[in-house]
């Protein structure tokens, strides 16, 4: 099983590389260890896994020495393929162990046809290994680890050494061009450090080696995107898509490749422009990219089109349709011809007139929620606005489904833009005063909205406030009683509010219920390795990592416990492969088996308000015994949490009573 959250011990990325990758050819500043130094713990064993891989790469006449590689012929493509598989299977320890082994020997490298590769100084690794290593370092940088500065330093040293070997290579001077994917990887490693100092350093290396202004501009764009400097990003964007007629054929081809490699930054820039209603500017960038024969992949294209529909940027959709062989469906139930300043009430009027049915028709009308942004942070103003829109809907259609659509749009907007108290107050107004509890329940049936309906919005809104642990517990218990279909995002919201050791029992309660209901969705088939694997989603792994890193006591104990749980659950799925034969669906792990994995005496499998308060008091006492106090303790408001939780319980009690009255 591949873990997506880091282990808080001595296995940080920077230390892993320093311990394993002590190869002067790659990192000359670390120096070569004495010959008596045993680099690998298993290098005395002739049957170690690295020995096996190297034997696969040997020519028939060579033999592998158990301690060192001396004067052997290895096939480059076989070793590279092994490294690529280790990278893809997320095994950095063995990856660097193998790279270290080949870097400390005297090897003659052979190409696929068996001829020696001699276009680089003797006893130096071929440049292909630099390209491959940059891919691995970039993959490591995607983790939520505290090693991004270390990776940035490594990438600078790697690039500097790469250019040095380039000048010393036997390739004819002037014809050698650096691998642009390697340059992109090094750039993004630097960018992820968010250090302007390292950015300037890599740009100087590019300038000294005549890599061209476009690469420097794209690296600057990537830096602005990573650091969310949107104004600066917009200023430099046009220079990243220059006049396509100014280049020769080779330079043009290289520029197109660079643009494609940096396409995530370009896509993010376009998304910012669309969100800011910079429609004309976005269209100009799209037209400039088309002159370079640049094409977005289907995923990015779909996301840009949907975002444009959400923000009613119809010119962008038309431009993308003109540049693409496929055409997006842009009809918005009569809204496509409306000016952007049309009010929400006018939009609802058109939807009602066109008999829009959100429970049957899929739509891209989320952009209407942006028309709520102008309302001030005043509860009475919002209540008045809700009344006006609802009165209009009652007069024109009185359809519960259209009112459900309006409520869902309203709460999705509130969950990300207002505090939880404000959001909960409006929900209470909708249920108690407006008597719209039926449309509220219907939001779960809106087409294409299964994972973003009202109650999921409540989970997300509550997770934005640190004083909502008991509130989220109450919300979960109330919905669990009626058999509600939770998503992994609901449990992510519960994990996010865990901020310190006092939250331990609540954390394991949420983690357990996540695995009860969602773990079968994390069991996937890896096409590359041709095997099944089980892994936690990245966001879940990040939330777990954040909680583990915030613990004041028992850090190692909890880290080991979480790792053991995920290991055991993953092993259960991989070993049992619990498929239902009739449909090919995956059977969730047995609850009794999962409880055994968590530990019956260690975990609270049932938790209500009283149990929560007792468990928190117990953990608080353990903290006081250690004389520990954190900023998170001061931020958490228990009284507010109790109040929110009671209001949530009252809401559900009221809705249940209304349902009983109608039976």
Swiss-Prot record:
Pfam families: MNE1
Gene Ontology BP terms: Group I intron splicing; mitochondrial mRNA processing
InterPro entries given in the database record: MNE1
Signal peptide per UniProt: none
GO cellular component, one term: mitochondrion
Domain of life: Eukaryota
TM regions (residue ranges): none
Further comment: Present with 861 molecules/cell in log phase SD medium.
Protein's name in the database: Protein MNE1
Organism: Saccharomyces cerevisiae (strain ATCC 204508 / S288c)
Gene: MNE1
